[in-house]
Amino acid sequence: FNAKFSSAYEVYESIYKQAKSSIYVVDNYIGLRTLVHLKKSPTGVNITLFSDNVGNNKLHNIEFTDFCKEYPTVNLSMKKTGGIFHDRFIVLDYGTADERVFLCGASSKDAGAGITSIVEDYGVSKYTPVIATLLKNPTLILPQ
């Protein structure tokens, strides 16, 4: 990240802290670690996780509920991706002049398990129709 090796926690935390109005995370493989990365997000920022919550070690409702109780200032919602995403990305401040997009090699739940890349993509306009479609998707219901 920023042309240097960093810990996954530092990278995610530094990206999320830059948000002014919203954070969108598109990642089909979410887990408790995904939520932990978001815990220091700025107060008042709306966070949406887009995921189909697939694979082993899925995020469960009890983990989500406990996280929300422990971090009540984190405004977090979830929507389905609809099974069409392989890549993972983060969108900060969608639809504003400050919009930024980051492409993430590894799933956020596995961040720190090995070397991966997170890069900023400066061609943000190509993501507008993708995010507009995702925002119309139904709410993700987590397993018990």
What are these regions (language model features)?
Residues 15-20:
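Secondary-structure "cap/kink" motif recognition
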Residues 1-5, 9, 31-144:
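PLD/PLD-like phosphodiesterase catalytic module centered on the HKD motif
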Residues 23:
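Catalytic histidine site
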